[in-house]
Amino acid sequence: LRVGDAVALRFDEVINGEIDIEEQKTGKRKSLTLPAPVMQMIARRRAEFPHDVHVFRSQRNRSMNKQAPVRREEVSKQIAEAAKAIGIHGTVSAHSFRKAGGNAIYKRSANNIALAMTVLNHSNITDTRRYLDIDKQAVSRVINEMDL
């Protein structure tokens, strides 16, 4: 999920461990089965904040009695601050997790680009190759394996 879709998630969109949403960026439908740890987190949040509409409502919105999710910009800001605090330098944002997740799926599936493309909800393979830097990875791997 893109961070904007994740923070906009409402409790009523989580049904039997699955979500079916319309992506904000593309307008395409996306269905996902949520892992057990995510479902446990959602259940804890629901129990702690039974009147919230959104799974990720900020403390500020809650104190102002505003039914709105946390802003994606705030999530990226918090991630960047956390990365800096543990010594990770450079650009780190919520989007970094989407790219890392896509790369992890690609590598764990024996380089199944079609699976990565499906998970990322890309319309064409060219976008997925560019997104995952596959050409760059392949060239680097071949060069490193050369016996010069």
Predicted features and spans:
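N-terminal core-binding DNA-recognition domain of tyrosine site-specific recombinases/integrases
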Residues: 31, 65-74, 91-93
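Active-site-proximal segment of tyrosine recombinases
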Residues: 5-7, 92, 102, 110-121
